């Protein structure tokens, strides 16, 4: 999860620089090249034999999808839905408030990303050391809601936008790191691969629906309506996490 967060942060920094140098078409060619490199890396991996084979069936899915794991799947779906929907309009918000030019977005993202990594460390430590993962996740969802409210209502300058973006990234990076860790400790060992597959599918479905719905809302209504949508999703998610059982098969919270 942490590596995914780092990759996303790097894309925010490098993307505007590449597009300013070679244009939007060059940016997509760069993405295609990186995809080919990724495929070569996957093909170069040694195939390891599974410890135990099991037949994929409806019963395997039903046994894997416990209440706890469904909550985690919905959590990663919601996180990436909020991310994708928010960043459909984030560049427009920056331009409308004349914070920085499109080519200089990295001036804003770089300090926010650096500060967010510093801010997430104590949250991760508290979560792991004191077994308070659920409550740290709820705190981070609250921070997501706070950041969306500021983006929605505030008259933004560079300083306020930087602080708000840092709050958003602290919450996002913390959740992105904690959810896969919690999933691996919650799922049964023999069905962990299936659980991780469903989890990853939920993540990318969240990205797809976030981009599609966020773009549709912006097209029909306006920029602020997108943030109202992400706030609505985050509030439902917060209550869903509140109802999540404290005890799981592999992890107990005290």
Where are these regions (language model features)?
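Helix-loop-helix hairpin linking two adjacent transmembrane segments in secondary transporters
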Residues: 2-43
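Juxtamembrane intracellular "pre-TM" segments in multi-pass secondary transporters
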Residues: 45-75
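Pair of pore-lining "gating" transmembrane helices in MFS-fold secondary transporters
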Residues: 66-86, 166, 170
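Short amphipathic helix-loop junctions that connect adjacent transmembrane helices
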Residues: 88-104
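C-terminal transmembrane helical hairpin of 12-TM major facilitator-type secondary transporters
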Residues: 133-179
């Amino acid at each position: 999860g942490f590596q995914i967060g780092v990759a996303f942060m790097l894309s925010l920094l490098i993307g505007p620089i590449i597009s300013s140098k070679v244009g939007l078409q060059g940016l997509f060619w760069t993405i295609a090249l990186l995809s080919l490199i990724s495929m070569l890396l996957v093909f170069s991996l040694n195939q390891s034999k599974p410890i135990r084979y099991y037949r994929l069936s409806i019963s395997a899915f039903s046994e894997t999808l416990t209440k706890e794991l469904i909550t985690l799947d919905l959590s990663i779906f919601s996180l990436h839905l909020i991310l994708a929907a928010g960043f459909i309009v984030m560049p427009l918000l920056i331009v409308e408030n004349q914070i920085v030019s499109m080519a200089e977005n990295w001036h804003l993202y770089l300090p926010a990303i650096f500060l967010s990594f510093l801010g997430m460390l104590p949250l991760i430590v508290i979560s792991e050391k004191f077994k308070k993962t659920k409550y740290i996740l709820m705190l981070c969802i609250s921070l997501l809601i706070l950041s969306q409210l500021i983006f929605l209502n505030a008259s933004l300058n560079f300083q306020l936008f930087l602080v708000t973006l840092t709050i958003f990234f602290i919450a996002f990076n913390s959740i992105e790191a904690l959810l896969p860790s919690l999933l691996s400790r919650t799922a049964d060992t023999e069905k962990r691969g299936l659980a991780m597959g469903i989890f990853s599918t939920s993540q990318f479905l969240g990205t797809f629906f976030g981009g599609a719905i966020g773009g549709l809302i912006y097209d029909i209504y306006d920029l602020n309506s997108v943030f109202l949508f992400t706030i609505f999703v985050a509030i439902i998610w917060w209550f869903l996490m509140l109802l999540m059982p404290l005890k799981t098969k592999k992890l107990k919270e005290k």
